[in-house]
């Protein structure tokens, strides 16, 4: 499939640098899906609350998406002189083409649609910052991504029409803004909570997988996850948030023995058909930003 043109302007970025960030995006997706055990999510142990996807689907999907991440970076660089609010429209065709390759790789299974949106935004932000010779840090990347999304929630969630999307219904019923709201706000759950939490645990010498699992619990406890709400309504979301917070209050995931609590949580999520996919997407961003 031919890739959409990025821009008429050229980029001065080295291909090796672009590929380095794209590789980090791929590794972030693999790190998340291979992390086990994760409540309600596909991992190395089981398929969580999903009957239509397996671990291998995520591996194929991540590989397909990796090939597109350089395009997001390149577009971010080539559009560096554009007003940030104008960038998102240019990213959409790249995202849709990437999504098409994901669906081809998985025979129609939606494994990483949320990550295409969020990683695409962050990669474009990185390209813009590099092109402008500005520092690439978690904070600058997320604030730049936020500038691309200014007004997105108003435009896409508060619009009233006869054929409301799932996101519009959840916003109007529960006030949840989902991936759009988190992006427009500059990923505060990641920047202010998950990322510092994860880095602190690593600094304390905790095993990286345990640290990431504990960080997932933090995200599950604080995120208004539209994936959960679409499956279990407000009651399902509040239950999942309470259970995750209870585990954190009881000490979180600090030793291999604590994994038993996650396995039980996983069984309960499967019984309730709840999958915190939005929190998984934010965990991908957390790991990705921790590397830059």
Swiss-Prot record:
<keyword id="KW-0547">Nucleotide-binding</keyword>
<comment type="similarity">
    <text>Belongs to the CitG/MdcB family.</text>
</comment>
<dbReference type="Pfam" id="PF01874">
    <property type="entry name" value="CitG"/>
</dbReference>
<keyword id="KW-0808">Transferase</keyword>
<dbReference type="InterPro" id="IPR002736">
    <property type="entry name" value="CitG"/>
</dbReference>
<protein>
    <recommendedName>
        <fullName>2-(5''-triphosphoribosyl)-3'-dephosphocoenzyme-A synthase</fullName>
        <ecNumber>2.4.2.52</ecNumber>
    </recommendedName>
</protein>
<dbReference type="GO" id="GO:0005524">
    <property type="term" value="F:ATP binding"/>
</dbReference>
<dbReference type="GO" id="GO:0046917">
    <property type="term" value="F:triphosphoribosyl-dephospho-CoA synthase activity"/>
</dbReference>
<keyword id="KW-0067">ATP-binding</keyword>
<comment type="function">
    <text>Catalyzes the formation of 2-(5''-triphosphoribosyl)-3'-dephosphocoenzyme-A, the precursor of the prosthetic group of the holo-acyl carrier protein (gamma chain) of citrate lyase, from ATP and dephospho-CoA.</text>
</comment>
<dbReference type="GO" id="GO:0051191">
    <property type="term" value="P:prosthetic group biosynthetic process"/>
</dbReference>
<dbReference type="InterPro" id="IPR017551">
    <property type="entry name" value="TriPribosyl-deP-CoA_syn_CitG"/>
</dbReference>
